[in-house]
């Protein structure tokens, strides 16, 4: 039975979908003004894993991940580049899709762009004004009146008295209270024409928080199963989403028997780089595409899922090399077994049960991967039909996390992308020269070739019958 840690309740809860057998899930996606970094990769990989396991468990999943394609940062970058907003955002949406595809991730079922949902956002803002939870200030902005919603702070655990307005937002001329946040930003004279839309409150554009409320409610309904995102979005973004969505539906006082906006809130942990916060100023800011120049996409996914999704993780080349070594162990167990086919996962099987128990415990991928390592050791010990069956089970269980689906030799010979640069053909030439040296009984030369290849990250393994296999270290 699946249990999910719900940020809202601060506890693990048995997962009970609103409609039996069906799951509606919304994840906050990217703001597209630059290339995606490894923090974005973690969000993509974590919720890709969640969807895969839900589907493997028999659920029909509707997976929605939005794109923020209008935002202050987007406007600033477009002005710097002297290009239209749409040209900038389309370019980085294409780059995001390319990164996601190279990582081997599934596409969301729906990927709404904020600019396609302006009408829905305006409708929700109008409802909040009608419910006396929003107002238009003197500067033309429409703001949410935070203090009028008594339950504000339920997700973050912050009370209105605890909130420090100075830390959140500087009070503007149009706000009645420093805690209030903007729903609709009035257009400024210097802003481009493609950043403004007509509205009942004058020309302007939506605030960031209202975008996700409107898109999720339009596509999934006012009450759905799972909302996910990075831990940094818990407050204020997700807190504000709850305020807007429930405020529009129920007004100022949601009753106990009223359905909440979302049943389960999931948040993945931060990424640190060499034990420091990732930032451009520290020079430790890594783009997905740059990481993939040095490391195999499957290695990057394995690195991300070796840690529990809620835990912070430390990014370093050493950690990625460790992940590569771990995957190498698993793939090595599948070598020398003809035609390893996946097998149906029978939860009566003790290996499958251990794996499923781990995944059903709040998607505990570290424990699930530990089961894969134990199973790989058993594959190495087994013989005959049992070895074939266990290898198929290893491939099947790994496949639920999108691991171990390649030809083992292909993975083992791919190695790290920042190796010496020896091609497969060059390595085979060295192996042929070593075979010739051994046949000529020049064992010193043969050993020298082995050592030279090892220094360049290539491991040779002599097999019965005079066969030599190789893999990258």
UniProtKB/Swiss-Prot annotation:
Binding site for Zn(2+): 28, 212, 237, 241
Residues binding ATP: 280
Keyword Metal-binding (UniProt): yes
'HIGH' region, short sequence motif: residues: 30-40
Primary location group: cytoplasm
Cofactor: Zn(2+)
Domain of life of the source: Bacteria
One Pfam family, short name: DALR_2
Annotated catalysed reactions: tRNA(Cys) + L-cysteine + ATP = L-cysteinyl-tRNA(Cys) + AMP + diphosphate
Annotated InterPro entries: Cys-tRNA-ligase, Cys-tRNA-synt_Ia_DALR, Cys-tRNA/MSH_ligase, Rossmann-like_a/b/a_fold, tRNA-synt_1_cat_dom, tRNAsynth_Ia_anticodon-bd
GO cellular component, one term: cytosol
Motif ('KMSKS' region): 277-281
Compartment annotation: Cytoplasm
Cofactor note: Binds 1 zinc ion per subunit.
EC number: 6.1.1.16
Gene Ontology annotations of biological process type: cysteinyl-tRNA aminoacylation
Keywords: Aminoacyl-tRNA synthetase, ATP-binding, Cytoplasm, Ligase, Metal-binding, Nucleotide-binding, Protein biosynthesis, Zinc
An MF annotation (GO) of this entry: zinc ion binding
PANTHER family per UniProt: CYSTEINE--TRNA LIGASE, CYTOPLASMIC, CYSTEINYL-TRNA SYNTHETASE
Family: Belongs to the class-I aminoacyl-tRNA synthetase family.
Record text on subunit structure and interactions: Monomer.
Protein name according to UniProt: Cysteine--tRNA ligase
Species this chain originates from: Polynucleobacter asymbioticus (strain DSM 18221 / CIP 109841 / QLW-P1DMWA-1)
Taxon lineage: Bacteria, Pseudomonadati, Pseudomonadota, Betaproteobacteria, Burkholderiales
Gene designation per UniProt: cysS
